[in-house]
């Protein structure tokens, strides 16, 4: 059984026991989080729409990490303007504990 869940504006395919890196979710490591299911597949049975109200996808926060550094640069022609910058996204590692 697996589910497609939505968090942080993105969708992730998860199964029970999976570790998933998602956009940062507030909470302490060890605390539980409920994720919003978009689709649930159990063998040949596919659950979508209004039937998802009875489906719960629970996960546990494992840790908060930061993603890889992304370097960028702004450049304006003929003016001598150059600007370099870097960015590291804050992520949360979740362990899916149950799809019911």
From Swiss-Prot:
Any one biological process term the GO annotation gives: translation
Protein name: Large ribosomal subunit protein bL21
Keywords, comma-separated and alphabetical: Ribonucleoprotein, Ribosomal protein, RNA-binding, rRNA-binding
Record-linked InterPro entries: bL21-like (IPR028909), bL21-like_sf (IPR036164), Ribosomal_bL21 (IPR001787)
Source species taxonomy: Bacteria, Bacillati, Actinomycetota, Actinomycetes, Mycobacteriales
GO function term, MF aspect, one: structural constituent of ribosome
Example of a GO cellular component annotation carried by this entry: cytoplasm
Assembly and oligomerization: Part of the 50S ribosomal subunit. Contacts protein L20.
NCBIfam families according to UniProt: L21 (TIGR00061)
Family from the record: Belongs to the bacterial ribosomal protein bL21 family.
Keyword Transport carried by entry: no
Known role: This protein binds to 23S rRNA in the presence of protein L20.
């Amino acid at each position: 059984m697996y589910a497609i869940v939505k968090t942080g504006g993105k969708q992730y395919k998860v199964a029970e026991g999976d570790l998933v890196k998602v956009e940062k979710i507030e909470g302490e490591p060890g605390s539980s989080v409920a994720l919003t299911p978009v689709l649930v597949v159990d063998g040949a049975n596919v659950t979508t729409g209004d039937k998802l109200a009875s489906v719960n996808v629970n996960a546990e926060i494992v840790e908060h990490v930061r993603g890889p550094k992304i370097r960028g640069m702004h450049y304006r022609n003929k003016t001598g303007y150059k600007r370099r910058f870097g960015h590291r996204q804050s992520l949360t590692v979740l362990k899916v504990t149950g799809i019911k």
